[in-house]
């Protein structure tokens, strides 16, 4: 078990007899086991009750930002800066939107099979906050950046999620907590132009996202 997983689970396991064992499924969980287990993530669809979620790897997944830039003062663009290695759905996004005037798309891990111009210098989390919209595209399971986006004054833009963590992404409401786009990303520009023209609606989504994030500070228990 990774040390971060050990310390995150010890917060709860320390209250139990050390002789007791628990069933843990490590890593990015994209399937549900046939027995009750503890894990970091699980599919949203179907019967997922056998995979009980604990707040694991929180140093990476549960990062929140203080954003002092009002939405209307940000750039009228979206940003996509993620690793696309072994993630064909993210590669399709790059193929479609690299060079788009409304989306600053780039990758942070170059590989020979990708066009060299796709690679852009890695920027810090706070540098993303100059953009009104930030893409939250799922990776191996969830979109890791979704939590800090929803704590900011920018709006998360993504297809409907298919995986969830302790953050309970499956309970997020499209166009209420985030801007939903189609799974093939084909309506991205249309959706961005709409919210640029209607900033008050984007600000309502931001307020709803902030309220959702605040729930994390009052719900420390495992999710089932």
Task: For each feature predicted by the language model, list its residue ranges.
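Conserved small/polar residues in nucleotide/adenosyl-binding loops
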Residues: 217-224
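Secondary-structure boundary motif
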Residues: 98-99, 197, 215
